[in-house]
């Protein structure tokens, strides 16, 4: 009996010790993660909100709170190291941006006093607030203001992105001034590090480069669905999904890929409202890859290969861009046929997801070869409340076969004709090519 009690006590000690050890490991791990996700106390963030964010209260919500590039990832500032800028944040933009000048200078001075001359002040601006930050940077370049030490800039949804921002597309355009919008052109080069974060198809930072009607219509829908202040809040810049990163000198450009074209979102909204998603989604999935090709033809590229070159809007689409699109058409048609067979529902507004970024002077495109996961915002929206009958299997198979035939015919049209004669290469059938990651709807 005594031995049995000793063994019982020993087992209890082992269990308690193991539990305590695991608890300590988990606690320490969470503590370490918390430290890794927080900007050092020697640095500070000054935030300038977008329209109607007069107190800069929404900046800390961006990208789940981790919106400051530090140590190869995105982190949040320490709780007592965020300094919001108070300004009118309204329309017309020109007078509102001018109103934010002095409050920004004051807040940078306060932050500098708190962290000292050796710390870094990160100036983060969203949309209209990014213009306030851009003007402040230009004053630093001109020597009219002194930040008192190192500063870095983070521009979210900025119209000054060199290749994509609407101000860069239409530099010094006079008529905009009549509406209170005076284009100041692309962001001015600076010796300070800058990070531009843009949501794909948001026309403020990702406006079409060419007069493509489909691209312009999609951009208009993108303004309604993607430019709203809460859009970036649910995404995580440290989540390995669809994001494209390009580093040029001191500047880092990030394009957050969208799941679906904003142009098709009204149809998805109506489909959700009347519980017909199970029918409409296979059809939308069938046409979206090809429609996306047509929309993307209105941009210089979709792989962010040259985001730092200021590019004006042009009425003419270069023949090379048209040829690139035609070469990708067979793969898009095949992808559409495959989507029609699967027909996975996706009814929420175009979500955005991102992957971690390493701020090194190298180019990197997120390595995953599949579309990004959807950030669900409402389960009731994504799931029809009542079962919906699908069309007869035979009818869907007929449509699918017809689409496959079209894809095969188009693909054969673009195949080089075989040589005739004894030296001709043996005939072979090429496998259907899928659209590349940069051309898929992410």
Please tell me what each predicted stretch does.
Residues 1-123, 134-442:
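Composition-driven, intrinsically disordered low-complexity tracts enriched in small residues
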Residues 127-130:
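Active-site loop->helix "elbow" adjoining a glycine-rich segment at hydrolase catalytic centers
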């Amino acid at each position: 009996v005594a031995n049995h009690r000793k063994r019982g006590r020993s087992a209890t000690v082992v269990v308690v010790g193991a539990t305590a050890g695991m608890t300590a490991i988990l606690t320490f791990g969470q503590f370490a993660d918390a430290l890794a996700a927080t900007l050092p106390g020697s640095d500070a963030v000054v935030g300038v909100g977008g329209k109607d964010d007069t107190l800069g209260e929404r900046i800390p919500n961006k990208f789940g709170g981790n919106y400051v590039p530090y140590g190869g990832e995105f982190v949040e500032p320490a709780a007592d190291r965020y300094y919001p800028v108070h300004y009118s944040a309204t329309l017309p933009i020109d007078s509102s941006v001018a109103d934010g000048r002095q409050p920004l200078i004051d807040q940078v001075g306060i932050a500098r006093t708190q962290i000292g001359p050796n710390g870094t002040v990160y100036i983060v601006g969203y949309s209209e607030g990014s213009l306030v930050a851009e003007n402040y940077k230009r004053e630093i370049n001109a020597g009219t203001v002194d930040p008192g030490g190192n500063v870095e800039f983070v521009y979210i949804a900025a119209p000054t992105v060199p290749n994509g921002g609407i101000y860069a597309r239409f530099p010094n355009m006079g008529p905009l001034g009549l509406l209170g919008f005076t284009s100041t052109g692309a962001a001015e080069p600076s010796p300070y590090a800058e990070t531009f974060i843009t949501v794909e198809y948001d026309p403020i930072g990702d406006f079409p480069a060419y007069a493509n009607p489909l691209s312009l219509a999609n951009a208009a829908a993108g303004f309604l669905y993607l430019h709203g202040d809460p859009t970036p809040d649910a995404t995580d810049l440290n989540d390995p999904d669809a994001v494209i990163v390009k580093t040029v000198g001191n500047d880092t450009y990030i394009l957050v890929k969208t799941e679906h074209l904003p142009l098709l979102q009204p149809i998805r909204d109506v489909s959700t409202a009347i519980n017909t998603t199970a029918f409409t989604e296979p059809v939308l999935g069938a046409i979206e890859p090809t429609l996306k090709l047509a929309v993307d033809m209105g941009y210089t590229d979709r792989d962010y290969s040259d985001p730092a070159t200021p590019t004006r809007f042009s009425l003419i689409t270069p023949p090379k861009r048209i040829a690139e699109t035609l070469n990708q058409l067979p793969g898009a048609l095949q992808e559409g046929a495959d989507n029609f067979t699967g027909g996975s529902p996706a009814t929420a507004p175009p979500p955005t997801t991102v992957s971690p970024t390493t701020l090194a002077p190298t180019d990197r495109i997120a390595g995953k070869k599949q579309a990004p996961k959807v950030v669900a915002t409402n389960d009731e929206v994504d799931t029809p409340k009542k079962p919906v009958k699908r069309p007869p299997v035979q009818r869907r198979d007929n449509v699918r076969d017809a689409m496959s035939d079209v894809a095969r015919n188009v693909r054969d049209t673009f195949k080089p004709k075989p040589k005739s004669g004894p030296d001709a290469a043996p005939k072979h059938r090429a496998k259907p090519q899928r659209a590349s990651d940069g051309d898929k709807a992410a």
